[in-house]
Curated annotation (Swiss-Prot):
The keyword Nucleus applies. This is DASH complex subunit DAD4. It comes from Kluyveromyces lactis (strain ATCC 8585 / CBS 2359 / DSM 70799 / NBRC 1267 / NRRL Y-1140 / WM37) (Yeast). It is found in: Nucleus; Cytoplasm, Cytoskeleton, Spindle; Chromosome, Centromere, Kinetochore. It comes from the Eukaryota.
Length: 72
């Protein structure tokens, strides 16, 4: 005897499988975008550190040469 719910169950499973496949594709895209954002953030962090080091160097040089002035 055939299970009366078999067709309904197989349809539900097919929908679940389709939804999981779409979810996996979305997660892959999200991971790619996060990698891209992280790369840009690393570049921004490096640039920020370079600017901070430059500012500290200029500040040190101005103090060493006694040419540092108070802000206006």
């Amino acid at each position: 005897m055939e299970n009366p719910y078999e067709k309904v169950q197989s349809n539900i499973l097919a929908r679940i499988i389709g939804n999981v496949e779409r979810l996996n594709q979305s997660v892959v895209i999200l991971n790619q975008e996060l990698r891209r954002v992280n790369t840009k953030n690393k570049n921004l962090e490096l640039m920020s550190q370079m600017c901070e080091n430059y500012r500290e160097s200029v500040d040190f040089q101005l103090q060493a040469t006694s040419k540092k002035q108070d802000p206006l």
